[in-house]
Amino acid sequence: MRKNIFKTVLTLLARGISSTCLAYSNSDLNAVLNGASCPGGDLSGADLSGMDLSGRDFTNTDFTEARLDATKLDKAKLQDACFQSALLTRASLRGADLAHANFRYANASGSDFTNASLQGAYLNRCQLRDAHLLNANLQQVKAQEASMDGVQADYADFSFANLPYSWLRRASLKNAVFHGANLYSAHLERSDLTEADLRSSKLGHSNLNNSKLDKALLDKAVLEYADLRGAEMNYTQFGTAFLDNAKLDK
């Protein structure tokens, strides 16, 4: 009997701690609902779906597990904000400053990050399927195992990004920059990398099957054991790329 009571107390305490960790600040939420900015605020677990928060300052704000479905955050200041495990499907973040923001385990599928800055952001295991990243700054992002199938990321800058084991199948990456990026064992099947800059990138064991690499720059890229079967490579510039054991036959 005493043992069962002890277990019940522990369970209730655990639930209380969990809810406390994700309980947003009522004053912060009310301020946002009344049109104010909220830098450094606590909006964890809050439902802000469909709201227009464009242009506001949310620097270092906690959005952990918040609901931001179809929320507008265009040109918002979101540096160092935490969106861990948040729902951002169909959200609009055009031109937003998201430098060093935390999107680990977040779902931002179908969202619009056109012209946004995500420099140094944490996107590990983030869901970004069918998102728009046109002309976005993704320099030095950490995106291991991120799911980005079907993204529109033409002219985006992924310089020195860390993208091992990421999923970028059927993505539009025309004129994108991956200079020095780590794409080890990444999935890029059927993606369009026409005129992309992949110089000095790490593509070992990556899958580029049936991708488009016309006029792409691959000088000094590491393509050991990469699968390039069926890829279109008209006028591709390999320079001194490392192609040891790469699969090139159709």
Task: Give the ranges of each region predicted by the language model.
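Bacterial N-terminal signal peptides that target proteins for export
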Residues: 1-9
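Hydrophobic helical h-region of N-terminal Sec-dependent signal peptides
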Residues: 10-14
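N-terminal signal peptide c-region/cleavage motif recognized by signal peptidases
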Residues: 18-20
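Tandem repeat scaffolds
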Residues: 24-250
